[in-house]
Amino acid sequence: MSKVYNWFNERLEIQSIADDVTSKYVPPHVNIFYCLGGITLTCFLVQVATGFAMTFYYRPTVTEAFASVQYIMTEVNFGWLIRSVHRWSASMMVLMMILHVFRVYLTGGFKKPRELTWVTGVILSVITVSFGVTGYSLPWDQVGYWAVKIVTGVPDAIPVIGGFVVELLRGSVGVGQPTLTRFYSLHTFVLPLLAAVFMLMHFLMIRKQGISGPL
């Protein structure tokens, strides 16, 4: 194993990267509340893993979505556990994200020179909520259907462009197959990609600037 490691280390300088990661200075005022962002990331990774597993069985059509979710829960080996963990970690992710935002705000972590870190964090918060809205509709049961109908109908109150925004969200005038397709695409591809990009930016800025000092 040492020969293999040395071979890679000569070409990629793995050891220097590992030393840089493990030797980063941690201020003495840091406590467990500074771990909330990391816990949020962990929940996101659990979401990715369990969500990916369910894509093998879920069918994003208005006629088969609900039945496919039932199939996952009752027929797929450990399907009930995978979906339950997905739901629990989703709730935990939202909770940890809210607590993380409060911690950063209360400790002044948004102040100069960390304004852009705060901005990317706010964007990630919006993405997290969007995950919840789009994921809620995917079982396409009564709760999911009416939730989508209400949420996508809210922009209708906007003057001039309201109708256009509603149709853009739904994919048609009413809520139906185009709506489910769009929400599925957002939930499984667009939002995870955006989350990954902004998380990378968020972490790189934290890495560069370090953790903010005490108030």
From Swiss-Prot:
Topology versus the membrane: Multi-pass membrane protein
Gene (UniProt): petB
Binding, heme c: 35
Name this protein carries in UniProt: Cytochrome b6
Oligomeric form and interacting partners: The 4 large subunits of the cytochrome b6-f complex are cytochrome b6, subunit IV (17 kDa polypeptide, PetD), cytochrome f and the Rieske protein, while the 4 small subunits are PetG, PetL, PetM and PetN. The complex functions as a dimer.
Subcellular location: Plastid, Chloroplast thylakoid membrane
A single Gene Ontology CC term: chloroplast thylakoid membrane
Family: Belongs to the cytochrome b family. PetB subfamily.
Listed GO biological process terms: photosynthesis; respiratory electron transport chain
NCBIfam families listed in its UniProt record: PRK03735.1
The record's free-text note on cofactor binding: Binds 2 heme b groups non-covalently with two histidine residues as axial ligands.
SUPFAM superfamilies with a match to the protein in the record: Transmembrane di-heme cytochromes
Keyword Transmembrane assigned: yes
